[in-house]
């Protein structure tokens, strides 16, 4: 029911008109008997107020004679979360026992004595107070000269116990002790009734009635008011004390704005002024401040009955205050402006004309309002103000009943009041005991939270069931359907918590930290049912207390009203099997004050509505009804933004429709549609028919004197796409998918989104195919894992659908599937290495056809890290091999057989030489069978050569010798040839020494040559000597001597020394040459001598000395790359030509002997 109270007030500036919207959340309880519902109509100047109130009734209870109305105004709405919750140590100590008698169901006509619980947990409101400007700086405001009679008649409604709400007349009398004008506010109030009949409003005449004589109108003229302002003050005060909860008062209709829970208070003050930015509390003089609890009779704050704490303060503002200066108002730490919503923004302070004096901000942590003055204080002087602020017990800081000393302060000046905090009792009938309150209202999400205590008295309850209804319940626990329903279904959040035996529930009926209780919600998964907007929880037999937290949705009315009600009931069986019921209902009551202006009736402002339809546009053409499969979309969130930036949201119904009401003409609004999950907005303005097109996700509309029901929008399901293709074995390694190349199964493929987050993993099927589904448009990354035994093939060689894309590739989805992401692999090839170990009998490091392999030589293979990966032995032919090797670096280690010696290394081609004891080898895409090694047995050579040559020559000759000596010495290595003779000697010495391994050679040559020549000759000698020496590692000495002499000497010296390895050779050569002898000496010494003279002397000396000794050289143990060659030693094992020199000297001595002999003979011939 909506009661509209219109009042008029006169100030120095003339008539004013203000409005206050208030919301009260109420609660009432029912037993099995009658139900008493109490509603409190809040009247005052300010804005909206939300209160949680409850009424309790039992069948044997008595009812109060009447309820009283409080004049209240909203200050702020936000719960202060900075304080900590006190531990709940006080048990639920009270109960209202409602055991019924059969006759108790009859309605009683006598007044009852039952305690009525009107629990208000709500947003606060403030009374606009009069601020009087005594000395105003030049102003053009004029006072109306026309006499205005404002007459209000107040009639007392008869007391009727069948009515939910009764009223009683005000008994206050006019006072002349203070000068004050109170602007009144037009207020609209909505009382949501229950099962009880409502009182009949009394007829109200448009008169001002004296408070002390309700039936006699008091006519007051403007002139009287000017002369006696106190009279006006009393009239307004009496009017504000009048109970309007059940008596609508006729008033001039004014505009009623959409009602919202956020506070918009108005404080009546004198007039504005301006500049500064510092705190001026010392320039604020507090003239009066009081704290009033509820009706002020007992200072009991019945927190669940909607009893508020009213703080009144009157103060003056010093003329030194400038624009930007600030002042503070402090709440007590145990109260909050609102315990239902989170909106605590204080209202601006304005004067009766609406001009802003100061703007306020609220600090949740300190519970302090800071007002910043505007330039109003620069324009006006002697400003007086009175504020009335409402607050409520903070259930977080005061969880249980207690006594408090509340302290409020204006500009640092404090006042205090002792208060007793009282909380509700559980409703009890038999073993059924239950209580509940609304605890949180969220207008943005359109949800209401309710907390229910089940069995708070911890009785032993049998067959316990609890109903949560989206409407009120009657006294038998039955559901009362009607207006004010919430939505109770499977989407309703219902949490159940068990209270341990050692835990006490806070009496505040509000839990802030549920973690301290055991969450047993899951135990009710199969014990919870829904039917007809009711949830039923089956608790069975219990003896513990439980807490139920319910968060339900509601749908505001088209004109923005919060028409919300929700009930709960508990039923148990007694020992006879009869049910006992106890129940509570919580609901919101909306009140709205309006005020008249200037004594004339102002026509009520007409309000308008907007809205229409949201549908699924299957064919995406942006036009409604073009496809038979198109259908309305329910539960789409639609948000309306008002011109001041505030918002309101509603969801589309089952038919896709939505609607917003209470909109003003000429104002511009914005409607936004939330895109549902999995959908995309359709085409905008697809037709010229505004009733059939889609207006998009956001549309702005201006009200032009009529409703606009053409704001539609369409959505279509967001398409999903696939990505993937193929992994195959690229047998020919060309990176192209050929028809005969098979797929590879079980290859792991990973999909990542554009941020690198893994969103899917799969493996290829038996044919090598893979696919990722349900993907949106966008960029993706696909990673292929290389399967064991395979190598990735070349990539990007041809078209996308036939090539290989690499191990990591990017795929783009743009309104179509992408099935082109392929990857090819080929089987990784394996290789072998090895070859041969042989007995190198001739120690030359080369594999000869006659040399045999060595069996059972251990060969070890290491990888690049030095890890042994294989060991084998050579077979009977000396062969070995390692197989199944990948390309890479390896080391082959040969273990030297006992008694054998490593032969020389790297003497010839890789496949025929010896590579040494350790060989590094690299395999690159091919086998390697060139890793060989050879060994031989160790030997020792000792050669001792002792040569003793004694030559005695005595010659006496006179000769004329013409000697032509041509000495040609070709020496390999170091050759030292000294020839001083008239002879031709040709010496050819070939020495070949081949020594390997450890060989010890000791050669000792001792040559003793004694030549005694006595020559007396007269000789004319012409000698031409030509010596050419060429050294090339081979010594060839050729000496040719031509001698012409009368003497014929034939000397033959034969010396043969042969030394072989492993033998001791002693050579002793003794040559004796004597003149006058014919000597024919044949020496195996490659010496050729031609002599032409008077006497024929033919000396042919041929000396061939071959020393077949090997001087073994122990090779170094080296580790080298297989392809490097070591420098070869000389074949003799040494780089000198000692034996050649010995032969040369022997030949020279023989030639010298011949010359002496030849000279002697020539002398004799003469």
Swiss-Prot record:
The entry's keywords: Calcium, Cell wall, Peptidoglycan-anchor, Repeat, Secreted, Signal, Virulence
Domain CNA-B: residue ranges: 607-719, 720-829, 830-940
Main location: secreted
Signal peptide: 1-52
Low complexity composition bias: residue spans: 77-90, 166-178
CC annotations in GO: extracellular region
Location of the protein in the cell: Secreted, Cell wall
Composition bias, Polar residues: 118-129, 179-212
Propiece residue ranges: 1133-1166
UniProt short sequence motif YSIRK-G/S signaling motif, positions renumbered to this chain: 23-34
Motif interval(s): LPXTG sorting signal: 1129-1133
Keyword DNA-binding part of the UniProt annotation: no
Extent of Basic and acidic residues compositional bias: 61-75, 92-108, 130-145, 221-246
Region annotation Ligand binding A region: where it falls in the sequence: 53-606
Topology of this chain in the membrane: Peptidoglycan-anchor
Keyword Repeat: yes
Modified positions (Pentaglycyl murein peptidoglycan amidated threonine) in chain numbering: 1132
Positions of region (Disordered): 54-253, 904-1141
Biased composition annotated in UniProt, kind: Acidic residues: 908-918, 935-1105
Stored Pfam families: Big_8, Gram_pos_anchor, SdrD_B, SdrG_C_C, YSIRK_signal
Subunit structure: Interacts with host complement factor H/CFAH (via C-terminus). Interacts with host complement regulator C4BPA.
Protein role: Cell surface-associated calcium-binding protein which plays an important role in adhesion and pathogenesis. Contributes to the resistance to killing by innate immune components in blood and thus attenuates bacterial clearance by interacting with host complement factor H/CFAH and modulating its activity. Also inhibits bacterial opsonization and killing by interacting with host complement regulator C4BPA and thus inhibiting classical complement pathway activation.
Family statement drawn from the similarity comment of this UniProt entry: Belongs to the serine-aspartate repeat-containing protein (SDr) family.
Protein name per Swiss-Prot or TrEMBL: Serine-aspartate repeat-containing protein E
